Every structure is written in structure tokens, then in C-alpha cells.
Amino acid sequence: MGKTVVIKCGGSVLDELSPAFFASVRTMREQGMDVVIVHGGGPEIGQMLKKLAVPSEFVNGLRKTTKEVLAVVEMVLSGKVNKQLVAMLRQNGLPAVGVSGVDGGLLEAEPIDFAKLGYVGRVKTVRSRLLRTLLEAGYIPVVSPLGIDQNGQTYNINADTAAGAVAAAIGASQLAFVTNVPGILRDGALVAEATAETIERLIEDGVITGGMIPKVKAALSALSDALPEVMIVSGKTTFYQNGTWHGTTIRKEVGVYL
């Protein structure tokens, strides 16, 4: 296999994915890259919990997951959102196969803090053989962020951290977080590059706010010697063309504050 790119699509951006997004994915494949997509589904989960009158709360930014909440999370992520995204990819000429982190024990999980969060898990191990098998057969694996432990208990996993774990396990050359903006913006202009140091300053200065904060923190935590840079890109426009990425590049090394 050649280079592998992991793309993380947040639940809030799935309805806004444009033809340009799918064209970017097609370009990658035409250039010999393998693509794995990990998706979220927070807004859809919230709507379904409300519709079914299942009580839910957030603790430190994570959805406390009772057995009742977990049943809805599984239904929405694997039964609805995953299949919708697979259908969208196929409509755009991209051969996709939807899997859950439970399938084949792909994402082995353990509870983060059962007393506080219930069935919210962290990825303990990624069994990447299933992904490699699908990639070698020419498919784009589309992964819903559910995990399973050795006793067969399923867990709700944060999609950003799941994407980072998958990228590390398969030796991805790039990890891209897809949002509804072109990247980190300052006064409406794109911040082309950022490091941990510059990101902390941008947060302090109120440049990075709201939902972008957990995105950039997840991007920073995904950085390693094997994955020295991560992208934040838009799902509304072309983010990869002619071998060039369009968005904010987040790197490990110290850079200049922009």
C-alpha cells in the first residue's frame, strides 16, 4: 500500500459536505493514496435523545453515556450516520464500506471513568487488520467511533481521539480534521500554520473559540514522530488538489506566532 490518509468528519459538518470535498477524496485515490474516514454524529445523537426523551448530560465535554444513551448512540452512529455517509461517498463514485469500531474488535476500548462518564471509552488497541483488508480490496473504510472491550461491552468513543488512534495504528502519512470553515481563521484570514505554542496564544487571544478548541487540541494530541503534522480543512471546499493541501497545518516543531 502507498500513503494512507485518515479523514475525520465531525457530525456537524456531514450535512454540508460539498462536491468539492468528494472531488478532493477522489484526487487522493487517483494519486495512489489510501483513505480511511472516521465520523462523528453528536448533533444527530442529541436530536434522537431528545426525540426519545432519554436524559443526557455532558461532563468535561464528553456525553455521559448510560445504557439507555449508549443504545441511542449505537443506533444513530452505526445505523444512520455511517450508512448515510457511505451512500454519499458511493453517489460520488467512491467505493466505501461502513464499519463500526466494534466490527472485528477494530477499536478495543476501556472505560475512561465509569463512575463519572458511564460507557464512554478510550481506545486501548486498534486492530488494523480489518482496515488493511478493506484498503487492499480497493475500498474506503468508513468507521463509526464505537469500541468494544474483551467482555463484549460496547463504548461510546470521542471521534477525534478515535481518528488519532486509527491514524497512529495504520501509520497514516496525514490526518485531516474536516470542519465547516477553511481552517483556523484570524480576522477572517486563514492561519496557514500553527504549533502548540501558537495555538495556546490563539486560544488566549480569543482567535480560536468554541467548537474549534477541542478540534485543535485533538489535532495536537495526534501529533507524533510518525505523524509530524495534522490538517484542519473545510468540507465545503476543495481541500486537496494537485498534491497541495488547503487548510491550517498543525505541526510539532516551534514556529513563528502568526
Curated annotation (Swiss-Prot):
Cell compartments where the protein resides: Cytoplasm
Protein's UniProt keywords contain ATP-binding: yes
EC number: 2.7.2.8
Assigned keywords, A-Z: Amino-acid biosynthesis, Arginine biosynthesis, ATP-binding, Cytoplasm, Kinase, Nucleotide-binding, Transferase
One Gene Ontology cellular component: cytoplasm
Known catalytic reactions: N-acetyl-L-glutamate + ATP = N-acetyl-L-glutamyl 5-phosphate + ADP
Chief location bin: cytoplasm
Domain of life: Bacteria
GO molecular function, one term: acetylglutamate kinase activity
Gene3D superfamilies associated with the record: Acetylglutamate kinase-like
UniProt key word ATP-binding: yes
Record-listed substrate binding positions: G41, G42, R63, N156
Gene Ontology biological process terms in this record: arginine biosynthetic process via ornithine; L-arginine biosynthetic process
Residues of the site described as Transition state stabilizer: K8, K215
Pathway where this protein functions: Amino-acid biosynthesis; L-arginine biosynthesis; N(2)-acetyl-L-ornithine from L-glutamate: step 2/4
CDD domains: AAK_NAGK-like (cd04238)
InterPro entries membership: AceGlu_kinase-like_sf, AcgluKinase_fam, ArgB, Asp/Glu/Uridylate_kinase, Glu/AcGlu_kinase
Alphabetized SUPFAM superfamilies for the sequence: Carbamate kinase-like
HAMAP family noted in UniProt: ArgB
Protein family membership: Belongs to the acetylglutamate kinase family. ArgB subfamily.
Main function: Catalyzes the ATP-dependent phosphorylation of N-acetyl-L-glutamate.
Protein name: Acetylglutamate kinase
Organism: Geobacillus kaustophilus (strain HTA426)
Gene that specifies this protein: argB
